Amino acid sequence: MKHLSLLLSFIFLTSACSEKPHKEKYEANWESLKQYTVPEWWKDMKFGIYFHWGPYSVPAYKEWYSHWMYEDGNKIREYHEKTYGNLKDFGYKDFIPMFTAEKFNADEWAKLFKDAGAQFAGPVAEHSDGFAMWDSELTEWNSAKMGPKKDIVKLMADAVRKQGMKYIITYHRHWLYAWYPTWDKSTDAGDPKYAGLYGPYVPKGSFKMGEKVPTAYPDDKFNQEWLDRLNELMDKYEPDIIWFDNKMNIIGEKYRMLFLANFYNNAEKWGKEVVCTYKAKDMAEGSAVLDLERSRMSEMKPFPWLTDDSIDWDSWCYIDAARYKTTNRLIDFLVDVVSKNGAVLLNINPKANGEIPSETKERLLQMGQWLKLNGEAIYGTRTWNVYGEGPQKIVEGHLSEFKNSEAVAQDIRFTQKNGQLYAIALDWPEDGKLTIKTLKKGNPYINNFESVSMLGCNDNLEFNQSDEGLVVTFPTEKPCDYAFVLKIN
C-alpha cells in the first residue's frame, strides 16, 4: 500500500509539472492584437461624455496652462507672474492645494450625463500635467492624497455604473515627457524634489507638439512608469473603455503593445468585452478603435470610429471666457457622425470647486430632451447605403471642426435599425416641404413607400415621390427645436 501511494504521488507530481502554463489569448505584438474585434455593444454606443478637470482648472485659463506658464514670452506666463508671482515661488504644484472640489458630487454628475442621453462617461484619469486623479500607490501626486483628497476615478466609476452607463477613462501621461522645463533651475520645475510631478530631467528644446518628431524620446524608466500607472488603473477600476490622447507614439512600441495585450487579456478574465481608442498611427490599424480630435469624417466608413470634441470652442477645461457651442451645433454634429458609423465623446468643463457651469448643464439637458424624443434614430443604429445628402461639405483633418459650416434643412442624414429607415433633416425647411433627392423615382435603394412620419408627431405626413426626390410635407408645428427625424416605411 505504501509503494502504491508513492507511485500515485509520483504520477501526480509528474503530471502537474508537465502541465503547460495557461496561454493568454492576446500576445504583445500587432499581429496578435489585430485579432481583436469591436464588441457589438460599442457599435450601439453613439454618445459619451467626459471631462477635463484638475489643478489646471484653478487658474481657469485653458488646460495647457501648466505648460505655457513656463514658456518665455507666452501671454499665460505673463498672466501667471502678474497674478501669482515668479515661477520659483509659485509653480504649477502650488495650484494643487487650491483644487479643493468642495462642491463635487459624483452621483449628481453621473445623473446629469445620463439625463443628457450619454451611454458612456468618465474622467480624464491623468492629463499632461502628471497629476493622477485616483488613489495611486505609484505616486504621491494624486487627488486622494492632495487637493480634493478624493479618489475621483473610483467615485465616478461607481456613480457612472450606478446609472447603467459604460465607464471610460482617458489617459494623457505620454504628453508629460518634456511638458515642463525640468532643465530650468530658475523655476520649481527644475527642482529634483518635484520630479514625481514634473517628470524626469530633459534637455532644453526637448518638447515638441504631437505631430512633430521629438529631439529626444522617453527612456525605459519613463515608459515603464507610463505602463505601470495604466496597469494600476486597470486593476483597480476595470474600465470598459480606455481612451488615449495623441502623441502616444513617443512611448516605446513594446510598451504600447504590452498595455493593449494586458487590457484585452484582463477583459477575458473580467468576463466582459472592452474598447481601447487611439489617434493617428499610435496603434496598428485594426488593433483598437480609431479616434479623431475636434474633427469628423467626410464620408461613411466601414469600421466604427470615435471623435472627441469639447463643448467650448476654445478650451477643454473651464475658462472664464468660454465660447460655448450651441445645442443645435452639438446635435447636428452628433447626427452627422452617427450617419457615418461614428460615435461622439463630448468633453465638458467643470469648475475647480466641482460645479458644472450652468451653460454646460443647459446644453446637456437640451441634448437629452432631443435624444429622449429622437433616440430611436441614433442609439443602436447602423449606417444605411449612403450617409446623407446636402450642400454641407465636411473638412477632414486634425482640429478641422473649426472650418465646418452650419448645416441647413437640405442637409439630410440617414440611419437605419431593424429594417427601419430614418432621414434626419438638420434644419426645418422654410416652405414646410423637404425634398429627399436620394429617394427620387428610380433610385437604387427603395421605391415602395407606405408611410412617412416624424418622431414626436402623431399623424403620418403627406409625401410624393417625383423625379426630383421624395417630397415630404412637414407638420404645422415643430416637435422639437433641433434636427427633425422622418421615419420612412
Predicted regions, residues:
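Bacterial Sec-dependent N-terminal signal peptides
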Residues: M1-H22
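Mature catalytic domains of secreted/periplasmic carbohydrate-active enzymes
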Residues: K20-N489
